[in-house]
């Protein structure tokens, strides 16, 4: 395979894995540990 193809595949895989990790952090098990600043400030 050509170098440009390998680089494009690598960057695509990196982007997909980063997006998957971000979604897991936002909506998966670690999301229970996130704090909500809007709930902390009661007016």
Curated annotation (Swiss-Prot):
Keyword hit for Transmembrane helix: yes
Gene name of this polypeptide: psbN
Keywords, sorted A to Z: Chloroplast, Membrane, Plastid, Thylakoid, Transmembrane, Transmembrane helix
Identification of the protein by name: Protein PsbN
InterPro entries: PSII_PsbN
GO terms for cellular component: chloroplast thylakoid membrane
Domain of life the protein comes from: Eukaryota
A Pfam family recorded for this sequence: PsbN
Alphabetical GO biological process terms: photosynthesis
Chief location: plastid
UniProt similarity note: Belongs to the PsbN family.
Compartment(s): Plastid, Chloroplast thylakoid membrane
Keyword Transmembrane helix: yes
Coiled coil: none
Transmembrane segment boundaries: 7-27
Topology in membrane: Single-pass membrane protein
Described purpose of this protein according to its UniProt entry: May play a role in photosystem I and II biogenesis.
């Amino acid at each position: 395979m050509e170098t440009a193809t390998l680089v494009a595949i690598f960057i695509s895989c990196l982007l997909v894995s980063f997006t998957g990790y971000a979604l897991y952090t936002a909506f998966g098990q670690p999301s229970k540990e996130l704090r909500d600043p809007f709930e902390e400030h009661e007016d």
